[in-house]
Swiss-Prot record:
One of its GO terms (molecular function) is DNA-binding transcription factor activity, RNA polymerase II-specific. Keywords: DNA-binding, Homeobox, Nucleus. Residues 209-272 bind DNA. CDD domains: homeodomain. It is found in: Nucleus. Belongs to the TALE/KNOX homeobox family. The gene is OSH6. GO terms for cellular component: nucleus. This is Homeobox protein knotted-1-like 1. SUPFAM superfamilies: Homeodomain-like (SSF46689).
């Protein structure tokens, strides 16, 4: 495999060529009485003459191009083009003559392809991230750029500005860019928190609305109760029959109606002194069968 590391004098060698050659020797075999160098040359010749050698060489070049500097990547691309134009070796042998060598070439090509994919993945992710950052910075800079001067006076002022003013302007633009970047980060944080806790917020809002609905009667029902209240203001104590009629009219249950009148009396009603005296007489004379009549209701024994 040393040919792979010697395809051009401008590409540095990578260690391990001898170990790869020995691995190939295990697969190819033969030449027990030959010297080590002769065996290596024989293996090189067998690999270079195999029909799969151009594919193997191309896969190797693609691996070396990953993460290489632009000049090295261009050089590797040119080498691959020259190899393809010149036949790139191979073709002399035939597949099936040496099944073990065929299997080795196929396996090694697959290994190089997978290796190239694994090498490319972090570089692709880094390139995508850098592209995204560049786009964001470009948007920030374009948004922070002030409009050009439109009058001759502005143009004269710009021509007469000093280097100190230019530095100050650049600093201001940098501050604006940093502020917008901070706002963008805050917005992203808010979006993340909203996505994470939106369910809890919705449940809390629903519970809060339920509590508010429980404590506030519908407008039509409240109007009907106020109408009864104003009509019977001197004695705002509805009887059970009154509560049933109000319940049918408002759609509320008697308990809600009773609670509303209790609260309404506590806040907005106070019996007169004469009514208090009448109530006391009514209570005292209840045993004698006396009944006190008021505007809309009665208090009896």
């Amino acid at each position: 495999m040393e040919d792979l590391y010697s395809i051009h004098p401008g590409i540095s060698r990578v260690g391990g060529a001898a170990s790869e050659a020995s691995g190939v020797g295990v697969v190819v075999g033969g030449g027990g009485g030959s010297s080590s160098s002769d065996l290596t040359e024989l293996m090189k010749a067998q690999i270079a003459g195999h029909p799969r050698y151009p594919t193997l060489l191309s896969a190797y070049i693609e691996c070396r191009k990953v993460g290489a500097p632009p000049e090295v990547a261009s050089l590797l691309k040119e080498i691959g083009r020259e190899r393809r134009a010149g036949g790139g070796g191979g073709g002399a042998g035939q597949i099936g003559v040496d099944p073990e060598l065929d299997e080795f070439m196929e396996a090694y090509c697959r290994v190089l392809v997978r290796y190239k994919e694994e090498l490319s993945r972090p570089f692709d992710e880094a390139a995508s991230f850098l592209s995204s950052i560049q786009t964001q910075l470009s948007n920030l800079c374009s948004g922070a750029t002030s409009p050009p001067a439109t009058t001759a006076t502005h143009s004269d002022e710009m021509v007469g500005s000093s280097d100190e003013d230019q530095c100050s302007g650049e600093t201001d633009m940098l501050d604006i860019g940093q502020e917008q970047s901070s706002r963008l980060a805050d917005h992203e944080l808010k979006e993340m928190l909203l996505k994470k806790y939106s369910g809890c917020l919705s449940r809390l809002r629903s519970e809060f609305l339920k509590k508010r609905k429980k404590g506030k009667l519908p407008k039509d029902a409240r109007s009907a109760l106020l109408e009864w209240w104003n009509t019977h203001y001197r004695w705002p104590y509805p009887t059970e029959e009154d509560k049933l009629r109000l319940a049918a009219r408002t759609g509320l249950d008697p308990k809600q109606i009773n609670n509303w009148f209790i609260n309404q009396r506590k806040r907005h009603w106070k019996p007169s002194d004469g009514m208090r005296f009448a109530l006391m007489e009514g209570v005292a004379g209840g045993s004698s069968g006396t009944t006190l009549y008021f505007d809309t209701g009665t208090i009896g024994p």
